[in-house]
């Protein structure tokens, strides 16, 4: 499963792009973030081996690949930008629903 998040209206390479998971009835879970300027990536240990974050600067798009999806990966996934100086998630995408049949 590959999710995409196209940026607009700001300097793509000046902000971290975060990915956040929300399962039905549960809270938000931070997956990780990538800095488009150099592709530096920081992942929640829980998602190492599960989520791969990449960016395409030419199309100002961030991607998240989920490896070997299972029903546990069924959730709404959000991308959200954060400035480098405080990491506050200040602008969120609308979310993408992923359903994996068991």
Task: Label the predicted regions.
Residues 1-102:
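Extracellular domains of the immunoglobulin superfamily
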């Amino acid at each position: 499963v590959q999710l995409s998040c196209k940026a607009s209206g700001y300097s793509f390479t000046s902000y971290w792009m975060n990915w956040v998971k929300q399962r039905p009835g549960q809270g938000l879970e931070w997956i990780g973030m990538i800095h488009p300027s150099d592709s530096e990536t920081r992942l929640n240990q829980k998602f190492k081996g599960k989520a791969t974050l990449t960016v395409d600067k030419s199309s100002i798009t961030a991607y998240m690949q989920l490896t070997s999806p299972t029903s546990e990966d069924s959730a709404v996934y959000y991308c959200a930008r954060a400035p480098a100086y405080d990491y506050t998630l200040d602008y969120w995408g609308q979310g993408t629903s992923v359903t994996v049949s068991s």
